[in-house]
Amino acid sequence: MVLAMLAWAGSFVSAKYLAMYINEHELVTYRYLITTSTTLPVLMYLNISYKIDLRNLAIAAITAILLVAYTKLFFLGTKIGTASFGGALITTLMPIIAFVIVLIFSKKKPIAKDWLALFIGAIGVSTMLEVWQFDLDEIFSTATVFFLWAATSWALMSVATAQSKSVSPILLSFYIYLIATLFNTVFFYENVSGSVFNMDAIFWVNILLMSIASTTFAATVYVAGMQRWGSKCTVFTFLVPFFVIILGAVFLGEAIQLSTIFGAMLTVSALMLINNISLKSLRS
């Protein structure tokens, strides 16, 4: 599980390298084509049928479109911003946004704990943005806007996939990747960067890491973890923002900002409140 979270964090660093080679439309097609191809052996190994009903297929289609949007937004944000900040902001903000969406559309009224969690989360995000230093134009720079919309897209994906019933999560993921590949290739893809087979080793290492390690591997391990440990598995996702910060410093030379670390800690605390996770349960 730790390796899976490390691989997911690595996707933000890989995006920074890939931005030097291809655009966002090419990235989506190449990434999810490889991911779709490498998910097939997983389905075969686990003996999972390819059959899916229309309801779950429709959910997969909606999620695929949101996935295309998320991937392009976080890629564009990382291209002009920093991978460490973007990764920390997105991975801590998206579950909070998902929680707010569920609160809005459900009949359940938020309790005091929920309001406290949202308040702590807001303080954490504000700390990462360093709102005390800039005016509004600087706070909501182009990169930050991309990251915020990316987090929102992923949150909507989480809400959509939660509606799926009686389907293997890995099978649902396979159709999401397949539809995302087809949708992007038909409507957006245009080869403007030349043949990928002429790209150097740096490109191939990063596209394979992003496609296989951070998507096929990480998603499969996470699903297996959820089946074995249930909701306790979510605690591992709290490692992602800190892994992103470390990887950004090691591979990209990005400065480690105390505001980013402290803000991530606050938002992780908010997520622990939302998920009813205590320090005692983490130790166990």
Task: Please provide the spans of the model-predicted regions.
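Glycine-/small-residue-enriched transmembrane alpha-helix faces in small-molecule transporters
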Residues: 1-26, 65, 69, 73, ...
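Specific transmembrane alpha-helical segments of multi-pass solute transporters/efflux pumps
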Residues: 7, 11-12, 40-90, 127, ...
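Membrane-interface helix-cap regions at the ends of transmembrane helices
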Residues: 10, 14-17, 21, 35-53, ...
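Transmembrane alpha-helical segments that form core, pore/gating elements
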Residues: 13, 36-39, 97-104, 133-192
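Hydrophobic/aromatic residues within transmembrane alpha-helices
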Residues: 18, 27, 31, 77, ...
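Specific alpha-helical transmembrane segments that line the substrate/conduction pathway
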Residues: 26-37, 67, 75-109, 150, ...
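Helix-helix packing/entry segments at the starts of transmembrane helices
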Residues: 28-30, 85-93, 160-181, 212-250
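Loop-to-transmembrane alpha-helix entry segments
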Residues: 53-57, 88-91, 107-127, 137-143, ...
